[in-house]
Amino acid sequence: MKLLKIIGIPMLAVCVLGMTGCSSMNNTGKGALIGGGNGAAIGAATAATIDTAAVRDSISAIISGMPGEIGVAAIIDSRDTVTVNDIDKYALMSVFKMHQAIAVCHSFDLKGIPLDTILEFDRTSLNPDTWSPMLKEHQDAHFRMPVSELLRYTLMQSDNNASNLMFDRLVSVAETDSLIATLIPRNCFRITERESDMQSDHAKSYNNHSSPSGVARLVERLFTDSILSTEKQEFICETMRGCHTGADRIAAPLAGKDGITIAHKTGSGYINETGILTAYTDAAYITLPDGTSYTLVILVKDFAGNEKQASDIMARISDTVYRAITRNKPNN
C-alpha cells in the first residue's frame, strides 16, 4: 500500500466530451429529453417498451398539490426517458458524494494511484458535531485509513467527515465540479460547497444543485458507460449497492422482491427556521431479474412536510415506475 500524506492534488486533466444542454441527450442513440418543462417523455427511435406519457402523467398526478417542488427523471434500459418538473435547480445534498467519488477515482486513475492507498489524519481534524459514523466507529486519536474505506463511508453511510477530508486532501470541490462537467452538461448542475460549508451556512445547500435529468445522466453513465478504470468504476457501483441510507424512499416498494438489485445515493436537507425541509433526494440504478435496468432520480425541494411524508411520495413514484416497467412481464 502507498502512504498518502498529500495536502492537495493538481487540477484534474479532463477531456471535454462536447455534450449539449439539458434539453437533449447525448448522441449515442440512447434516447432524448425533449423540452424539459413540467414533464417531457420520449423513447428511442425503436418502439417504446413502456407508455412514457402515461408514466409521466401518473407521476404528475402523485406530486400535484404536494407542499413542495418535486422533480423526477427516469431512464429505462438506456432508452426510454421520462422527466417531470425537470426545469428547476434542486439541492443535491449528499447525492453529490457520488459525484465526489467519481472525481476521486478519476484523479487516482490519472496518477496510477490505487484505492488502498493509506491516508493519515488526526481526530482533531474531524468535526464531532456532524453526521459521521466513521468518527463513532473509530476511537483512535490518529487515523490510518485506505481511501477506499473513506469512499465506502461516504457512499454507504453518507459520512460528512470522510467527504470533507477527501475534498480538503485529495480532490477539491472545484476540481470535482470541473470533472463532472465533462460527463454531463454544464448547465444541469453545479457543485461549489463542502458539507462543512453547508453546515456553517445552511443557505449554501442550494449552491450544490442539479436538475433531476442531470443526476440521471450521471448515474446512467456510471452504470452503463466507461468513465473510469474498470476496477474503480465497479468499486463505486458495488459500494452504492450497499448504501445503508434511505431504505424508505426509492427502495421501499422494491424491498423483498426476489432478484432486484438497487444501487443508490441519498441526501437529506436541513429544516429551516420556518419548518421547511430544504431538500430530500435519492438517485438510484435498479436492475430487475430479467436484466431490465433503469435509472430513477427523485429530488424534493422546499417541502412543507416531514421526512416521512417526503419518503412516502418518493416511494409512490418509485412504485409507479416499477409497475409500468413490469406490467407486461411474467412473474412480476
Could you describe each region identified by the protein language model?
Residues 91-121, 154, 296:
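Active-site SXXK
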Residues 23-53:
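Short, low-complexity, glycine-enriched hydrophobic/amphipathic alpha-helices that associate
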Residues 51-60, 168-169, 173, 221-260, ...:
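Structured C-terminal helix/loop/strand segments within mature extracytoplasmic catalytic/sensor domains
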Residues 17-21:
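C-terminal motif of bacterial Sec signal peptides marking the signal peptidase cleavage site
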Residues 48-89, 270:
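Beta-lactamase-like hydrolase cores
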Residues 106-126, 173-177, 229-233:
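Short, well-structured active-site flanking segments
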Residues 126-164:
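Conserved catalytic neighborhood of penicillin-recognizing serine enzymes
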